[in-house]
Amino acid sequence: MCASFQTTEEFAALQLQGMRAAAQPTSGDEETAPGVAQTRQWFEAEPLWFKRAVFYEIHIRGFFDSNGDGYGDFRGLSEKLDYLQWLGIDCIWLLPFYESPLRDGGYDIADFYKVHHDYGTVEDVRQLIDAAHARRIRVIADLVMNHTSSDHPWFQESRSSPDNPKRDWYVWSDTYDRYQDARIIFVDTEASNWTWDPVAGQYYWHRFFSHQPDLNYDNPEVQQAMLDVLRFWLDLGLDGFRLDAVPYLYEREGTICENLPETHAFLKRVRKEIEENYPDRVLLAEANQWPADVVEYFGEDGDECQMCFHFPVMPRMFMALRREQATPIYEILDHTPPIPEHCQWGLFLRNHDELTLEMVTDEERDYMYSEYAKDPRMKLNLGIRRRLAPLLDNGRDEIELMTAILFSLPGSPVLYYGDEIAMGDNVFLGDRDGVRTPMQWSPDRNGGFSRADFAQLYAPPLMDPVYGFQAVNVEAELRTPTSLLRWMHRFIQLRKEHPVFGFGTYEPIPTSNPRIFALIRRFEDDLVLCVHNLARSAQAVELDLAAFRGRVPVELFGNSRFPAIGELPYLLTLARRGFYWFALEAPENENSNA
């Protein structure tokens, strides 16, 4: 079997010895190591794995450089799998790694079948997947279905001649006045969704950057080509895809060209392919829309994507924290429709993009800018390009509280690489690069990310006194029992011990204090009460728990038993930015009767 670590101290000792991989298997281990087929059997036995999973998003370029060229790569990621196994994550989400001119961080794909040379080879990807699977870690990857790079051979052929067989693979027009109701997404950089191409002698359609022409999904050949891409990577062992920019696949006059019926019809076709040939794989939709629109991407009875990101809940968590009011969280959850039982929301605090403010009012957006983006360089498009720790002023209590709320909500949490050690950002780097700096492994050269000369690095590591790699790194936090990293490890393990967080229902709990966010998670006979204090000061609260009278709250972290719930409101006092998670145990006589 693969090496595993019984304690944090064992892993820390190995890491501090400078070992790139935590342990090498002995000959006996090799004989008993699970094969690819056996691992896949394990995975297929748990088709709803994504409902209880903790995801971890990785920018390959910024994670670990194995060959000293200044760029993170697949072999480097493979060397760090034992760290991820120890941390407790269940699934790695990879940002785009395909061949690309990298004008948009890899979301401008020039070849769906090739790996960017900085990252390695297709064989390196296969080896990573096999090594992750051996540790019971799944791997999903971004797939950009909506568009390609303008450097893609498909587009080069399409623009070359009106008679080219691939001319109709993209959306061309003699004028730029079609689809006028469609909004411009990148308002900072694009003035139109149409761009003139002098070679083609026509305008081409793009919902994002002008160097990212949209594919024409009205062409059956395009649909088949994208299905072929999916099959290629799934056959390699990938466990699924995060479908980027999925609402924009089709265009129709008189609409905003988003969430169209034709898009859902194609997604049903994709899901049918998955169900018939890859039954344990997952599709995660990126649809930055209101929940009432996003639920359509689960499909009728869950026949489209198994998971969808819940974007609007994220800015409201930050809003609730600064306002010290739970109302924004309650309201967005109240406006979230039910989803099919075998589907799941994807939830996150931060990711590789800006903290999007598209799904808030103008007044709320101005408030968020005034609180979290006081420097104009922190703004990007309709969002804030900052990491979690700087957003929260590096407050340990705030980071723990926001993580606790995230983990308590109905959905599967997604962590962004480096947030487990409170990495900072660099607002002086352009575009979104400020939140994609190198992972900080140690206080050594380049933060332990790379042996390359500083000038060779794809981006400079952080070196300021608060967030720089000499102050914030994995090695230092492994040494410290009270570090955020060690806390995060324990917290992930705690959540995984309670299936109610992955499979349970959500019930808001009435409170006497608007600064308290309280909820019940219920799954079969398990009940967990989560109470969070959003205030900067200690708060007392009375909870209406009469429906659970007789049950005994047992605090999950310390296993402390609190007084049994009675008819009267239940009184708690929480520290500033504090929280409690309780298992509500049935009375002993009820258990004995059972």
Where are these regions (language model features)?
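Active-site and adjacent substrate-binding regions of carbohydrate-active enzymes
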Residues: 1-594
